[in-house]
Amino acid sequence: MTLKEEFIKLGYTEEDYEIIRNNYAVNQIKDETLIKKLKDNFAFLLKMGYTKEEVVKMTKSSPSIYGLSKENIKQKIKDMNTLGYTKEEVIKMTKSLPQIYSYSIENMKQKIEDMITLGYTKEEVIKMTKNSPSIYSYSIETIKQKIEDMITLGYTKEEVVKMTKGIPIIYSLSIENMKQKIEDIISLGYTKEEVIKMTKSLPSIYSLSIESIKQKIDGMIALGYTKEEVIKMTKTLPAIYGLSIENMRQKIEDIISLGYTKEEVIKMTKILPSIYGYSIENMRQKIEDIISLGYTKEEVIKMTKGLPT
């Protein structure tokens, strides 16, 4: 069986084969040698916990995996264990960034050190790279430039560091896309200053499409709010954009079960949007606590209708 046939047998297309075979990392390897590496590494990666489809996808993206020995791969996992990752985390990270197997552990250590100089702790860098392994593919100059670009948008360096701790994928967004997102949100009824403030509190807004944001507004209008009220509420509690409309409906139903009408719940959440962030158990407990002070449940309900805070 030819090398191409061996690849196709494992699930690659002819186009996949050409891409891999012509890659600089393996194009000097003889066919018979590459056949052995193909079989050995493919089987080894399956044994490590990847699916057949994942191995195909990974090696198309990073053909150099077929230039590595099984010992190289095992050693990389061990080295990453010493950095603070578990084997399972390494497997997950390399599914999205298989090039990690080709990075030297010294370069990875240096990237961690460089990130620490920007204001992160080692633990934060490890956590960030678990969520966004692509950070390892960026030069420290690129990361510094992203911070500088975000400062020009209206953030401080400290705010950028804080935002990227929670949503490290921000480093993978182009500054042009971020500017466009700000413009798109402004077109919905916010000011630039309000968008900047909202994204400080909820950086994941940058990962939402403008269509998703518009859909959330439409969904909330269907619940009983006006567009203007949604805009006002999300200025106060941008985390609303991180909630599903189904969860919001359920929260309304749960609060109705406590003794309120739907209209009253809508009115209360206009005044205090953060109600959507409360668990129904905590709300029940608060009612019980106030009752223990000498009020009836009906009195508590009446009081909180007018003053939900």
Task: Label the predicted regions.
Residues 1-309:
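Long amphipathic alpha-helical repeat/alpha-solenoid cores
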